Amino acid sequence: MKRLLTLSLVLSAALVGSVSCTGSTEPSAELFQPYKTTALRTPSVPLVVSDPYFSIWSPYDQLIDGTTRHWTNDEKPLDGFLTVDGQTYRWMGAERTILATIVPMADEEAWTAQYSRTVQPEGWQQPAFAPGDSWQEGQAAWGSDGLSYVRTHWSDLNSDLYVRRTVNLKADDLKEDLYIVYSHDDVFELYINGTKVADTGETWVEGVQLHLDAKLKALLHEGENVIAAHCHNTTGGAYTDFGLFKNIGISNAGIETAKQKSLDVLATNTYYTFICGPVELDVVFTAPMLIDDYDLLSSPINYISYQVRSTDGKEHDIQLNVIATPEMALNKASQPTNTILMENNGLQYVRTGTVDQPILAKKGDGICIDWGYFYIPAANGTVTVGTDAADKPLLCYTHEFGKTRQAASFMMMGYDEIEDIEYMYKRYKGYWAHGGTVSIFQMFQRMRSQYQSIMQRCREFDKMIYDDGLAAGNEHYAEILSASYRHVIAAHKLFQDDEGNLLFFSKENNSNGCVNTVDLTYPEAPLFLCYNPELQKAMMTSVFDYSLSGRWTKPFAAHDLGTYPIANGQVYGADMPLEEAGNMLTLAAQLCKLDGNTNYVDKYWNVITTWADYLSENGQDPENQLCTDDFAGHWAHNTNLSIKAIMGVTAYAEMARMKGLRDVADKYTARARAMARKWEKDAREGDHYRLAFDRNNTWSQKYNMVWDKLWQTSIFPAATMEREVKYYLTKQNKYGLPLDSRKDYSKNDWTMWTAAMAGDRETFLKFVEPVYKYINETESRVPTSDWYDTKTGLMAGFKARSVIGGFWMRVLEEKLNNRN
């Protein structure tokens, strides 16, 4: 389990070596002032983010409220301290538990327990329960093949697993500070001697630490105990594992807590200010993800800038410390690591990574990287290796300001994955490495020497994102976009293949881990269509090539290209024919409209024609197909899926017209109009349109219709969209518009698409404000969940997904209108 630092050992004699380097430009005071202050309480604050693996967040209001984490919720500890005249203040991270095993989990031992996959009667979790014939013995963990440490297979959809684990405890065990740690997928209930102690609802999480307070610990007794779990798998992966641990952490006595004065989140920068006695500390976390600079967009290096200011007019002796752990480079805390001091071209580094270095050996959803190396250079301070209370190494950065009234500097941290992705059985590094001709050390040197100019460009980019949101909506919309930019970009990997194609692959975070999923590429598209359509092409080219090459032969687009980071072909078990074909054609048409020509699609015209014909022939009244919105089950005769097909046929006609194929364009335009007329008649139910053609008293968001407005193609009568939008306003809940009439949950990416269908800004903002309220108030402290309950504000599932690039749909509409 997690082994965490005891600060007193780091700040005293635990250092085993140190090296330093100075000489970089001091940041200007302007860099510590955000372009705009923001009021939005982001559920999880981006700190150091680069790609799906190098991704560190603070899911707290205060940076000291807990341990910094990867989006998976795995701990990736960063601790920050400022010592002023001998008094140390903690400004980042929290004093953490160090868990030692009493009863192991599956990553330490193949523990054995009784289990059943038959629905059990009341009392099955009680110690006195006598398991019958449906019970058998199995080894942990239970779950889907391919998930970590699964030794007993269980993965059936809509199925149940019951586990009874007998645990023998000594009197001394009960005197400890106890934790139960569990991992699960999906709905999970945990019992101690028959009493329920955890009930998760539908979610999937690894390594949840449940502290046993006095009341919960009293459920245990000396001798034999039964810890029981019930897990229900709804869909996708399944998993169950749990264990019992004790906290052996040592209190960091004498360290005071800094007072957080402010927090502002903009597109590329997160700004904090802390009060540390007579000194204020400004800290800026910067991910220089400039969308028009591919080297910076793909760079695995982030800045942390810091400034100290005396508030009493006096000089103070000041030292800043930032401390990381080898967990930055681990998938499981039990993996052996190697942490060293090293030098390259006159600059010193502290580096950590696993001993085994299993490059690209793992693929999947809720996992962290365990190959490559995490680095902190001594660009403006000293780097050291320390040890924690469990004798684990620490990576320490120190800046000695000495006596000063005001001073500023910056540090960097980065991650070299060595090999980042496999595409069609060839391995590639990120774009920034230019095929291996640029090393991580050269990239650090560039980022160091160009710090001032890069930071200024980031400020200008922050301004553009905020101002575009303000112009299209209001301050709340601008703050939503500002808080979402790094979230979207960090779910991707940018690289170039051997043929020179620019490729930009998403990871389907927290919803199966697929790579380059087309029904993520579609909802996230507005961001990239606004600011860099070449990146949109970089998500689509590989899908077109997959069909063009003959590797994918079906008459519609593939769902995905594999499981991240292995992109060798579709792995998803079921197709989404209308969904993916419609997505690809619609986006292709929008790209052609932005380019003013069809050069991008000409190579793929035969493939595109095949897909268009599939939509034309099958999209009027869809059969029972999977689609992207089948959370409550997929229904035949889906009206929104039919709209997707109609707009896909329209998209083909628009591209044909641009190619000069007038007869083809007229034919498919006529077909789209005929489909739309029938759709309007068959879907109409008084003041709105149904969820499915044959389902009375239903409704759903018809977000796919927004393209008819953006393109001004008038495939549907104007009154159709107006009628739907007016109806939606009667269905909103506290935190937004449900996805459809079946459940209270929604998808905020689609809500923003739907909002863009509104005829005026005032109506648009009526949809935006509940989404803002959700982001601002949700108790689900994760990188913004796109799938959530509109009444409770709690996530239903999904986090850190790139689909919230869809928040930019209104900005896209504004930009397209300004072009016309």
Give a label for each model feature.
Residues 135, 159, 167-197, 227:
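Aromatic-lined ligand-binding clefts that engage carbohydrates, nucleic acids, or primary amines
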Residues 67-98, 187, 249-259, 521-563:
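Carboxylate/His-rich catalytic cores and anion/metal-binding grooves
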Residues 145, 149-157, 251-299, 377-393:
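Extended, loop-rich substrate-binding clefts of extracytoplasmic carbohydrate-active enzymes
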